[in-house]
Amino acid sequence: MKTPRFSHKKRHRSPRAGDGDHQLRPHPITTIQAPQKSRRGGESGAADGADECLPAVVEWEKILSEWPPLEWPDQPIRPKAPSLRDVVEIRLLAFAGTVAVGSFFVWMFNPDHRGDAWLFWPLALSLAYNAVWWLMEWSNYARPKIEPFRAPRREWTVDILTTACPGEPSGMILRTLLAMKAIRYPHTNYLCDEGDDPVLREACRQLGITHVTRGDRKDAKAGNINNALQRATGEIAVVLDPDHEPSPYFLDRVLGNFEDPGIGFVQSVQAYRNQDANFIANGAAKQTYLFYGPIMIGLNAYGATQAVGANCAFRRAALDSIGGHAAGLSEDMHTTMLLYAAGWRSVYVPEVLTRGLVPETLPGYCKQQQKWACGSMDLLLHVYPRVFTRLTIWQKLHYFVAPLYFMRGLVALIDVIVPIICLAFGGVALHINMVSFLGMYAPAFLISTIARQVAQRWSIEPHERGTHMVGFVLGFGCWWSFLRGILCALWGIRLPYIPTEKMGDRQDCWGLAMPNLIAAAACMVAIAYGLSRDWSPYNFCMAGFAVWGASQLLLVAAIGQQRTLEKMRETLARIPAFLPVVKRLRKILIAGHARFV
């Protein structure tokens, strides 16, 4: 199916009243004044064809109280540029780690060490998966490149677009619209409203924002944006997710990079405002810290920066050259691959210029990961081969390895099943003692851990440093959502594009917990049977691995039962001795309706 082309008419205009001064200066969003309630009449920013009925009521005071705007620092935080010592240290670690990984696999694949083939090869796949990710991380750590700030030297015409879908909280979208309006650099705002919501339409009229809707939902988010691009005429098109609130200086920090005519897009950090809401939000955020920090800084050096769908600025000519935003569940990666194949380059700005939301509920997180897994694997199978010859060597490597991230679901399943089989059926994956195995595997694992800590010296924000175990446990416990997404891509099952639920009601998700409960029960049965049959050190090691896996599965299964946990909290709250425990449970496990600033 041929993607439509878009007209691109260059325009020149002077700043509008309300656009604001585009000089970089303190301007916290908290100074935004809600528009005054107006009656019929007056200029409207709504799309053509708006009805002549009385406008819907926009309760600005209620919206701002429920969705308070962020306060921004006068200048964005930039990570410290890596010193020569940092680079030398990380490269030495990368070299040592590569040697350790190679030595381990040469030793492991010794024919004398191989056990039962039906256990050895799945275990080898699991270990190889970890090794590939270590090598990918180290290659990016070894060449960090932080671009210097470039102020815009000319006036650009800019369109900022965000989307709205039925079911998304209108307050969240309206807060983003207010923040878009407060961006100081002159620009034109667009709301791409799939549902033609009357409240959003009226808010756009009051704010002077162009409201665009359409009669169908073809190509989901990409089609929604492309529909608005047919009306927009700016030289730069910025795409914001509706939950991402931009800073007033967003455009000031990215536009200067477009002075190079070969730059097709500029991506900034995807940061969050609710990462401390609960265990799920914290884990989901921590899964991204390394990617948006040291890894993307390294990809920038290799010319392989990835557009991530939110807070990305595109040169309009670049988008037009590929027929607009590419469609799909991973439309951001698809668009990136096509832009690189067309010869465009990119810049990564390692600054927090927007803050959004991560899922706070288990259903929201699992649906998001399943969608990304299916979309990324579909790109690897169908798009990557078509653009392969037009990508650079590092782009080829990254866009081959990146979709494999979602194979972690299969790897987690292997990590659970192998100990179960060894305990229940006496299978042997490796004919070696555990001390020898740990002695060969530990160097690579330790180097990986140390390298991450060194690379975190140029993390974006201080709270992004650490071991990120919460993110690992959450991903391990949601193995089936990754695996289901991969299988849907392999079998050609089309998943609908559904916006990720970021905040939901307290509810129990026993259906989502069943895969974990079944796997954990199998671990417990295998441990009991295996140890009753054989008390050998080997069986004790397998039992240890089974306990480790089952504990993670049960923890994530428990966290998904929001209503039950809330009832437990209310019961324990009646007992004074349990008040400290109750407060801790509420902080870690319970996803409430509060908005975390």
Cite the ranges covered by each PLM segment:
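Acidic donor-binding segment of Leloir-type glycosyltransferases
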Residues: 177-217
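Membrane-embedded multi-pass helical conduit in multi-pass membrane proteins
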Residues: 100-128, 138-141, 150-152, 405-496, ...
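Long helical/loop segments within the catalytic core of UDP-sugar-dependent glycosyltransferases
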Residues: 140, 213-236, 248-330, 338-341, ...
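N-terminal signal-anchor transmembrane helix
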Residues: 114-118, 128-186, 568
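Short, charged cytosolic
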Residues: 25-73, 368-388, 481-492
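Loop-to-transmembrane boundary segments
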Residues: 79-94, 169-174, 388-411, 493, ...
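Catalytic beta-strand/loop signature of glycosyltransferases that borders the donor
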Residues: 269, 347-355
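The conserved acidic donor/metal-binding loop of glycosyltransferases
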Residues: 241-245
